[in-house]
């Protein structure tokens, strides 16, 4: 669905200059396993049903003019899950990255690629690459851990506050304006701790495989009403 058509039908506010569109949206696509159980499937089956929502969200954000999206694929803690589930979400992340690489995007996969848990198929994506016409920055966190991300800070303790962002592993990812989490959980789960310091955080109770455009619309309407203080 073209988001401008959707927006025109649902809420004319988003079409005007009054709408504050976030430059960078973080996406925590939670609830895949609970969705599977609710639909009579084993827990490992739900991840595949999260692929189309990821592509749909990308298209909606691109049409709206969002400049950057970061998807939370899986964390180093997630790899402690049962092998069947782990294999399923790793495969889903590989498939998702390959699917997004067919779009117009500047794509980057970020995570601990030195670990055996990092899928080898995604190694070529650990350097940002332009696909199609490029334009929108797409970041995909794979085998990501906040401790891994910040580990360089121990070696750069003398760095000034303004230079800290250059020392972390995710230094090519911008500050996040809005984080949207599906699945109802009210926590960030270690999502980009430095870039998310002043992020607004919106939670959607529906599970990720049940994504619908209204979710994004509701998040953007809520975001538009927030005061931008940055601690001031």
What residue spans do the PLM features occupy?
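Flexible, compositionally biased loop and terminal segments
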Residues: 2-232
């Amino acid at each position: 669905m073209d988001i401008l058509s959707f927006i025109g039908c649902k809420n004319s506010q988003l079409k005007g200059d009054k709408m504050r569109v976030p430059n960078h949206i973080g996406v925590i696509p939670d609830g895949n396993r609970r969705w599977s159980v609710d639909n009579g499937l084993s827990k490992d089956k739900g991840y595949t049903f999260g692929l189309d929502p990821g592509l749909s969200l990308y298209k909606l954000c691109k049409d709206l003019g969002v400049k950057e999206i970061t998807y939370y694929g899986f964390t180093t803690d997630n790899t402690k899950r049962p092998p069947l589930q782990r294999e399923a979400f790793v495969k889903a992340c590989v498939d998702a990255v390959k699917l997004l690489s067919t779009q117009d995007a500047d794509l980057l996969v970020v995570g601990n690629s030195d670990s055996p848990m990092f899928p080898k198929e995604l190694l070529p994506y650990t350097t940002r690459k332009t696909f199609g016409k490029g334009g929108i920055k797409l970041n995909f966190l794979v085998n990501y851990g906040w401790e891994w991300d910040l580990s360089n800070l121990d070696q750069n303790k003398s760095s000034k506050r303004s230079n800290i962002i250059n020392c972390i592993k995710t230094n090519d990812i911008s500050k996040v304006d809005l984080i949207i989490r599906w699945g109802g959980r009210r926590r960030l789960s270690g999502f980009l701790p430095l870039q998310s310091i002043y992020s607004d955080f919106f939670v959607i109770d529906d599970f990720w495989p049940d994504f619908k455009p209204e979710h994004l619309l509701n998040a953007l309407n809520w975001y538009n009403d927030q005061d931008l203080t940055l601690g001031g």
